[in-house]
From Swiss-Prot:
Gene: gadC
Protein name (database record): Glutamate/gamma-aminobutyrate antiporter
Family to which this protein belongs: Belongs to the amino acid-polyamine-organocation (APC) superfamily. Glutamate:GABA antiporter (GGA) (TC 2.A.3.7) family.
Lineage, uppermost ranks: Bacteria, Bacillati, Bacillota, Bacilli, Lactobacillales
Keyword GTP-binding: no
Role description: Involved in glutaminase-dependent acid resistance. Exchanges extracellular glutamate (Glu) for intracellular gamma-aminobutyric acid (GABA) under acidic conditions.
Cellular component GO terms, alphabetical: plasma membrane
Length: 503
């Protein structure tokens, strides 16, 4: 019996959650009207190449189950395959910190307790309470919280976004003052000022993770037509919504007053009180809704990305104890190690950056540079596929034959290199006395992270550690569409009786 194929809309819905990146709107706002240029650049010249190349690799015979781990292992060898899945997982450990900073920014307004967002010690304690509370809530299995994640996405992400867009539209139509200049010169950044370009990395972050959905092209009806169409629709929607969201923040909050972790709440406060001074309570309600929504998103990240590392453990690439799960199919040892790493990142970023905008910017840049190393491997693998493994059968091809494939992948590869290097330039939005701190935290953290998977691979004795299960990729029906694609993970947790933790 043939499995029912995904329609264009069904496939689009699997990835649509990535178009609402509310917590990035304040960072987008720091680029003022340049945000439109950066969104177009990232969407057309980075997101689409990643999406198209991933789709072709996902349909190669023998590559359909393993995701990026399988793709890289099949071409560059197991060592680099492990590194790719490691980077895909490790970037999330930094991403947790960024997300929780955003939650703390919202809660600081609700509780009227600004120290929660500005004092490094209090902020770090708040981060630990939220992160570990959400981590332990996931040990009972992700099925228990799946409905909560969906509710959080609707209540805390979709509804506030609609309200924000509506308020901003009313504000602009009313002819009210706007905090940023609007003219023909304001759209294109000054490329001679490198410090104004570094914010581009946050726009790349908004597009990351689409490769996790590419595997579902094997379930899509008429993929040659529908897959590119779905990706084009997705990028148009992402550019439109992110442009509106970022502009809404930039237009009403002066740049010098903008908090990257609480900027969305600042915007709601300004807009709501502009229309009615008696609705301060409504701002707190919306802030609480947003905190709830992002908490739901963070909770969905706890288990998802560790699935790839669990697949590596089941291939014998990690110590045996990392194959352990509890009865709810949660890889507890991996999740606990992940928690320790997040705690360390939280300490480094919060105390190293002083708990202010610097901490948030370093966290975003570090997330991006870690993920970009994985994407560089991704594009290298694609070049190997189209030049050295042309004989491998596949059901989808990037348009343009070998020349078109080379140009499309080449653009994505070069833009990845550009974003990687530009990340280390201190942004124009931070004070001059903070530039050295920004570079040192980012550079040291990046170097340690870049060599870590290769050290782990070399030190772990892989003799006698046979593969107990090959990775099994998610089908479309296994995916919770409310979860951001980069945080879902791509593989099932294959539970073995002998590897279940005993109480």
């Amino acid at each position: 019996m043939n499995q029912k194929k995904l329609s264009l809309f069904g496939f689009f819905a699997l990835t649509a959650s990535m178009v609402l990146t509310v917590y990035e709107y304040p960072t987008f706002a720091t680029s003022k009207l340049h945000l439109v240029f950066f969104l177009l650049l990232g969407g057309l010249l980075w997101f689409l190449p990643v999406a198209l190349c991933a789709a072709e690799m996902a349909t190669v015979e023998g590559w359909k189950n393993g995701g990026i781990f399988s793709w890289v292992s099949q071409t560059l060898g197991e060592r680099f395959g492990f590194a790719a899945i490691f980077f895909q997982w490790f970037q999330i450990t930094v991403g947790f910190v960024t997300m929780i900073y955003f939650i703390l920014g919202a809660l600081s307004y609700v509780l009227n307790f600004q120290a929660l967002n500005t004092d490094p010690l209090i902020k770090f304690i708040g981060l630990l309470i939220i992160f570990w509370g959400l981590t332990f809530s996931q040990l009972g299995g992700t099925q228990r919280t799946a409905k909560l994640v969906k509710a959080g996405f609707v209540v805390g992400i979709v509804i506030p976004s609609v309200i924000l867009f509506g308020l901003a539209a009313a504000y602009f139509i009313g002819g009210n003052p706007i905090e940023i200049p609007i003219n023909s010169h304001a759209f294109v950044p000054d490329f001679s000022q490198v410090s104004t370009l570094v914010v581009f990395v946050s726009f790349i972050l908004a597009y990351m993770g689409v490769e996790a959905s590419a595997s579902h092209i094997n379930e899509l009806e008429n993929p040659k037509r529908n897959y590119p169409l779905a990706m084009i629709l997705l990028v148009i929607l992402a550019i439109s919504l992110d442009a509106i969201g970022g502009f809404s923040v930039a237009a009403v909050i002066p740049q010098k007053e903008l908090s990257l972790s609480a900027g969305v709440i600042q915007t709601f406060q300004t807009l709501i009180l502009h229309f009615n001074h008696h609705l301060g309570w409504l701002v707190k309600v919306i802030a609480l809704m947003i905190a709830f929504g992002v908490m739901g998103e963070v909770s969905s990240w706890v288990v998802g990305p560790s699935r790839g590392m669990f697949a590596a453990a089941q291939r014998g690439l990690l110590p045996k104890f990392l194959r352990k799960t509890n009865t709810h199919e949660v890889p507890v040892p991996l999740v606990m190690i992940q928690g320790i790493i997040v705690t360390l990142w939280g300490a480094v970023l919060t105390f190293g950056g002083g708990g202010n905008n610097l901490s948030f910017l370093v966290a975003i840049s570090l997330t991006v540079v870690i993920y970009l190393v994985g994407y560089l491997l991704f594009f290298i693998v694609y070049f190997v596929l189209i030049y050295k493994k042309q004989n491998l059968k596949r059901t989808y091809n990037v348009p343009g034959k070998i020349i078109g494939k080379t140009i499309i992948a080449g653009i994505g590869f070069l833009l990845s290199i550009f974003a990687l290097f530009i990340s280390f330039v201190p942004p124009a939005s931070i004070a001059k006395n903070e530039t050295h701190t920004y570079q040192m935290i980012l550079l040291i953290s990046f170097v340690v992270t870049a060599i870590l998977p290769f050290i782990i691979y070399e030190l772990h004795d892989k003799k006698g550690h046979d593969t107990i299960e090959e990775p099994t990729h998610f089908k479309a029906g296994d995916v919770n569409p409310a979860i951001y694609p980069a945080a879902r993970g791509e593989h099932h947790i294959i539970k073995k009786e002998e590897h279940i933790l005993k109480h």
